Amino acid sequence: MIETLLLVLVCIIIGGLLSSLAVHLMPVGGAPAAMATATGIATGCVMLMTGAAVTGLFTASTVASFWVTKPNVILVALSGAVGSMLMMGFTMFVGNLIYIFGAGIVPCSGRVAVDPITKDSQTEYKTPRTDGHGVPTVSFVSGILGGFSGGFGGALIYVVLVSDSYADFSVATAGIVAMGIFIANAIIAAYNIGGTIEGFHDPKFKARIRTGLTCSLIVSVLCGVIIVIAMLTGTLAGGVM
């Protein structure tokens, strides 16, 4: 019993940390990106990661249903990662289509002079008085990695909660709890970022990722302890699991 409780706690902590890392990897441009004056997707960190998390949980829950009992943790977690990656990939791709063919701009970074992946120069394509625009290659790759990290983390939390070998929560409860832990970490990461971020190449990523992961660790441990208490008592926030 103790081994099971510790395993659930560890998986929740790992899932929370991966969720926080995912938010820092996302190319988020916020309101400025809606006017093509900042690099990234024209939305906030929490909204973007919520969409990725829901997609990942949909695919993870579908794959988990293939087993009557004891779903394969790794396969379910990977399925969640793939679902989130696809969601992020399509979102960034369609966003670039609108930027390129709708607004007539070239996706480029406002934080680096040369794309670290393609080695293409960015400066001459950046519109004056903007912080870049669109989703350049390095941001696209960073977003895909963020989708993988967040989807894997969220699905990992879900599968250990729903599996009868571990927490044995109902499907609905496991989904709600996994989503709650994911969003809690996403909100804290969003406050840590404090605006827009382009991805792992952004100086803001290197400067703030350690603080973000530290805060995520604290939150994830707290959430994990609550889950362990729920497992021991058979209740969750006063309700039956």
Place the predicted regions along the sequence by residue.
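Loop-to-helix transition at the N-terminal end of transmembrane alpha-helices
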Residues: G30-M47, V171-G175
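A generic, lipid-embedded transmembrane alpha helix
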Residues: T39-T62
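Alpha-helical transmembrane-segment detector that highlights a single hydrophobic TM helix
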Residues: T59-M92
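C-terminal transmembrane helix-loop-helix hairpin of multi-pass membrane proteins
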Residues: I2, L6, K70, I74, ...
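Juxtamembrane inter-helical linkers in multi-pass membrane proteins
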Residues: A103-R129, F200-P203
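Cytosolic juxtamembrane amphipathic/interface segments immediately preceding
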Residues: V28-A33, S121-V138, D202-K206
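N-terminal signal-anchor/start-transfer transmembrane helix
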Residues: L7-V28
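Hydrophobic alpha-helical membrane-embedded segments
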Residues: A81-G104, I187
